[in-house]
Amino acid sequence: RGHRVTLLISQKKVDAQASKNYGDLDFRTIEAIAMPKIPSLSLLGFGVRLYKAIRFSRHLLDEVEADVVIGMGGFTSFPPVYAAHRKGIRTYVHDSNALPGKANRMTAKCCTNVLLGIEEARHYFNPAKCIVTGTPVRQEMVARKDKNEARAELNLPQDRRVALVMGGSQGARNLNSLVIEAARQCADLCDFLIITGSADFARVSQLTADMPHVHVIEFCSAMAAAYAAADVVISRSGASSLTELAHMGKAALLVPYPFAADDHQAHNARVFAAHGAARMMRENTLTSDDIAAFLNEVLKDSSLLASMNECA
């Protein structure tokens, strides 16, 4: 607050879609850069793209007269942070994960301080540089919504338990399929609100057309309402989702994305499970029966549900 903020985002569709809700902010795009495996013939092309991104970042820093640069992760953050460091501008990197990414560990070497979402990540960096700040949540999450109002907004029943299912920004086809099978077993137990992602919306809508207790949406721009409406959440374990779960105090079944870099989502999920806020299950062994059993256990035991909510 009180500052001019310029947000550098990638050219990916998901970033463009998310930025539409914040038309008052200054968004600029930068090429998404992924570090290739070493050794690799792709290294030459990576080096060229990295050089261009650093040069672009230097010009942008001059244009906006930047006083501070904060990298939020990924190799796309490295060029502006490195360019700012070379220009003598204060630089920071923020990492929300229990296991920080390689890009952040590299970027941190040219940062004034490292900002952490959780304490468990400290030992991956220079401890003297680290400050545990937590992970920011969207403004809409700050004032928690009333459950009944949230359900009315999303056309969900007031007199039933609700399980919120979200597979991350890109959705999760296999997880969605398992949830659909579990939903058939749990028709008398709860309603389901499934956020599918754009790639799986049509398929899930068709498969659940005869299931009135399953509500399917492609993309949710009212996540505060979705969390408030839910009694329990089935989710991937990306840092942003977990931060929101903790802020909203929601019990969860966490299914880490199996192809996440360095399996960092599993590390995140273990932290929540160790604190009693969630159960963690691996996707390669997860069955619809497992999901149904979890929902039956948690939703039929009010004291267990309350305890998990409190631990979150």
Predicted regions located by residue number:
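Conserved nucleotide-sugar phosphate-binding/catalytic loop shared by glycosyltransferases and other
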Residues: 4-48, 58, 133-135, 198-200, ...
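Donor-nucleotide binding loops and adjacent catalytic segments primarily
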Residues: 13, 17-23, 147-233, 266-270, ...
